[in-house]
Amino acid sequence: MAASLEELRKLQEKDRCVVLQGTVEIGRTHLTRLLDNGWLQEVMKGWYIAARPGTEGDTTVWYTSFWYFIAKYAAVRLGEQWCLTADQSLDLYSGKTTVPVLVIIKSPKGHNNTQKLMYDTSLLVFQSEIPDQVYKEPEYGLNLYPLAEALVYATPRYFQVERIAARTCLAMIRDAADILKVLARNGASLRAGRIAGAFRNIGNSEIADCIVSTMRGFGYDVREEDPFEDQPRTPLVYEVSPYVTRLRLMWENMRDKVVELFPEAPGKIDDVEGYLRSVDEKYSEDAYHSLSIEGYRVSPELIEKVRVGNWKPEEEDKEHKNALVARGYYQAFQAVRGTISDILKGKNAGEAVRADHPVWYMQMWMPFVTVGILQREDLVGYRTGQVYIRGPQHIPLNPKAVRDAMPVLFDLLKNEPHPAVRAVLGHFFFVYIHPYMDGNGRMGRFVLNAMLASGGYNWTVVPVERRKEYMKALEKASV
């Protein structure tokens, strides 16, 4: 077994995600041994992905490997003569991270058969011509339509079903040149009218006018048509990062429902000290439920022990992870309490959380520094590696995207007038982005309560008994 694991380790050093085609890269004995012991899982006959024993039935391994598998399978079967559809290319350009139920690949070598994959996902290789030039996506190695060509050839339905993704991609176009090259080369008057209408919908009349006038100048009968069913509240500006536009559109799309369903805000708190005492009274209950949601085993006695300072990390608690986590939660809770005090005294809630959330995170993990498990530098800044959530189809943003997204989140919080929207969407967006390697759920619930305080709402505990419902709601909003 040790020899087989060594072979797997060599493959993992070479590739970010191990996808194997039969015995091409590993001997049959090693393959069989790794498969029998849970270190590999079969995706389809003759194709395997790396896993860990005990993860059978857990979708995380598959969702983590999904796009790597698609890219390698297509490259082996089709060479470079393939690409995703225009619609699915736009999904990826827009920063949509949800694993789709069906992937459609276009290729002159396509056989028009649907191949079942793991966990109710499927792959269709459709016989079709592909663009003269395809874009090689750097993260997974996928072949995509070039952005401008994908917008031109997207289905009309895409602009209605995937409004956020479509508008995000439109906002990534600086001028009309690349769009016009595609339209002029293929003489697509109907598509020209649709894409011109799409640009006008997001507030970019300059590109819309340029498309219409240029194509008419070439002799095409262009009739502009808006493919969307609604209008964004504010015009979208050119933005290189898709995540900036995507987050703003998601916020706009979700906020009205929060306002509709949430009770009216109590308003400004006059008795600041009284409110803070009520927060203190919630500590034990909040710590128990918040940590239990994350899977830690903490008792009321342990929570009280770390609260009163009867905690000796250098002695009996040094190897007790639950005690370290509980102490960190207490320290972070006190930091959040300080932020709430500033908010109640008049500081803008978004600005307060922007300034203080690194301190919350630092305090959450300082006990691990105290006992030497973590280094101080580990607590500085956002994550630098990819993180995955067990179970959900949603894959958190990549590290570069996190740095694009977090300033947008705090800008949205700063400028959002309704405290309930700040609370609900602030919490959801924080978890959606997942800016840290660990502790995102706890941090998200701290954001929730800091923003609730800004509207005079009471500190709210998410009970562990409703964990499944809570997680399902977060997942539903993410996909």
List the predicted regions and their residue ranges.
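FIC/Doc superfamily catalytic core
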Residues: M1-T29, L35-V43, A51, T55-V479
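Conserved two-metal-ion catalytic palm core of "right-hand" nucleic acid polymerases
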Residues: W47
